[in-house]
A protein has these predicted regions:
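Membrane-interface "cap" regions at the ends of multi-pass membrane proteins
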Residues: 33-34, 46-103, 270, 297-300
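Extracellular loop-to-transmembrane helix junctions
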Residues: 37-55, 109-139, 148, 353, ...
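Helix-loop-helix module between adjacent transmembrane segments
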Residues: 46-47, 94, 127-143, 147-212, ...
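Flexible loop linkers connecting adjacent transmembrane helices
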Residues: 56-82, 105-109, 114, 130-159, ...
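Hydrophobic, membrane-embedded alpha-helices of multi-pass small-molecule transporters
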Residues: 84-101, 238-246, 255-319, 358-367
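Extracellular/periplasmic helix-exit of transmembrane alpha-helices
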Residues: 136, 241-252, 299, 306-342, ...
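Loop-to-transmembrane helix boundary motifs in multi-pass membrane proteins
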Residues: 160-161, 197-201, 307-316, 323-331, ...
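Hydrophobic alpha-helical segments and their helix-loop junctions in multi-pass secondary transporters
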Residues: 175-201, 210-211, 230-258, 443-451, ...
Length: 508
């Protein structure tokens, strides 16, 4: 009787012994398979170490004050400024900055081979997470100031006005891009009467509601749930990468592009534009002020701003590795959404594929609504329109939504319209990071901090964006070495301008 009871107890999946046995077996499999993916495994570890070491160093450089009153209390209006739990802020920040970037961008970027690993790790730790942390913390110190105001304070009023227009355009493009994609996916997986137009209207209506209501009513309640599903999906894929033991390329094999059109898509600078959200994205600096207005303490900035970006980098690394496996097995013919669905269904079954599609649908929607919310706040600050009353919020929001709707109509009427919008969105996204990094550099000089931390990333991203303008087919499309010479000249010009400013500042 005792023997029978023990066997039945062992077979019960809820039994501790069974669970420990399952963990031991799978751990042994994972340990054995690690030899096939050393570069990938080391990259994940480096991202975590980057948060613990360089993130801590960045925090010490900024010197957050735990006793300082934050805008969540000093400007509490019950709409955009209010204290929220730290875990909620982290989840909202993560979902705001993620969107489809660390999934679709990483899948596209995987076509550049092991170079994608290097860019995600180095870019995320030293450029992207640093950019997100300092832009968020400067906003916090400036009373929750939005990005154009921060740029204006440190780069001048003319730059401020240009960046105000540029930022609103970028945010509207984010809203457009992140309406079209989820609507198209929902169109394919729902009944026929729920067509693309139907879902665009539904998503648009949600955008309007989420943009107008106080941040704790919609965003504060549902975003953490969506963030959990996105993280769960990534962890599931990560576990299956290790369990399946897929063979991934190593850096020791050399850095070579596996892009099907590698003749016209060089690793530099195309990859640095393609993989944005997993490494560095200017859009993030428009979102950090939203959460800076809800932080209870300056000390919480590192886990929220730096930590959310590191998590996004890990997610990008996971999807890049999964995509490399997919390209080796199936080739390059499918869309990014189809690749996500195939990988999750193959590795995680029906439940995994459902979670994946939820992530692919809801991640861009949640980035889109906060983008339009940011656009409303920037426009309201410029027009000096108080946003406490919903009627005033509606007055500012309607023109933004009207312009967004017109661009969506264009993207649907022209077969190539969406691709054009996406390419220019990608470049403008990274161009925004250039201005943000230069503003951070000036801030660090003025406040006697080690400004080289921001200066080197600022020069590099200037080089990336300017070279892309000259080399990309949708821009000037110049061949040979000329694009790189011109891009280098632009980067050198930025250094000379900065050096002259330093000289004048020292004289003052």
């Amino acid at each position: 009787m005792l023997k029978k009871y023990s066997v039945q107890k062992y077979k019960n999946p809820y039994n501790l012994c069974y669970c420990l046995h399952w963990i031991f077996i799978n751990f042994a499999i994972v340990k054995k398979n690690l030899k096939k993916m050393i570069t990938f495994s080391v990259s994940i570890i480096l991202l975590i170490v980057g948060y613990l070491v360089y993130g801590k160093f960045a925090e010490r450089v900024f010197k957050p004050d735990s006793n300082a009153a934050t805008p969540a209390y000093t400007k509490n209006d019950g709409v955009d400024y209010m204290p929220l739990p730290t875990w909620k802020i982290f989840m909202i920040q993560f979902l705001n900055i993620a969107g489809l970037g660390p999934i679709f961008g990483a899948i596209l970027g995987a076509q550049f081979g092991t170079a994608a690993y290097i860019w995600i790790v180095v870019g995320c730790i030293f450029i992207g997470a640093f950019h997100d942390y300092f832009s968020g913390m400067i906003s916090l110190r400036e009373g929750g100031a939005n990005l154009p105001d921060i740029i204006g304070k440190y780069l001048g009023n003319t730059t401020k006005q240009v960046m105000r227009v540029f930022t609103v355009i970028l945010l509207v493009l984010v809203g457009v891009v992140f309406v079209s994609q989820p609507a198209g996916i929902l169109d394919r997986i729902t009944p026929e009467w729920m067509n693309n137009t139907f879902w665009i209207i539904v998503i648009f209506a949600y955008y309007l509601i989420a943009t107008l209501l106080p941040i704790d009513k919609v965003i504060g309640k549902i975003y953490p749930l969506f963030a959990f599903s996105l993280i769960f999906m990534a962890l599931g894929v990560l576990f299956m990468i290790f369990k399946q033991g897929i063979s991934l390329p190593e850096i020791t094999d050399g850095i070579a592009s596996i892009h099907p059109q590698k003749e016209v898509t060089p690793i530099f600078p195309i990859m640095c534009i393609t993989i944005a959200c997993g490494a560095i994205s200017g859009f993030h600096a428009t979102q950090s002020p939203l959460m800076a207005r809800c932080l209870k303490n300056e000390k919480l900035g590192r886990p929220v701003f730096y930590g959310a970006m590191i998590l996004e980098g890990i997610m990008a690394m996971i999807w890049a590795a999964a995509a490399i496996w997919y390209y080796k097995e199936k080739g390059y013919g499918e869309t990014q959404a189809s690749i996500v669905y195939f990988i999750t269904e193959t590795w995680m079954g029906k439940v995994g594929s459902v979670l994946a599609m939820l992530g692919v649908v809801f991640a861009p929607i949640t980035s889109g609504d906060t983008a339009l919310r940011s656009a409303r706040l920037i426009l309201a600050d410029f027009l000096k329109i108080d946003q406490t009353k919903i009627s005033k919020r509606l007055m500012v929001s309607l023109p933004i939504f009207a312009i967004t709707a017109l661009i969506i109509v264009y993207s649907l009427s022209d077969a190539a319209g969406f691709n054009v919008i996406w390419r220019y969105f990608g470049w403008s996204n990274q161009a925004l990071s250039v201005f943000t990094l230069w503003a951070i550099t000036v801030y660090m000089v003025i406040n006697h901090k080690p400004w080289v931390m921001a200066f080197v990333p600022a020069v590099y991203m200037t080089l990336v964006c300017s070279t892309y303008l000259f080399v990309a087919p949708e821009c000037f499309g110049l061949g040979g070495s000329l694009p790189y010479i011109l891009g280098g000249a632009c980067a050198c010009a930025s250094i000379i301008i900065f050096a002259n400013w330093i000289k004048k500042d020292n004289q003052r």
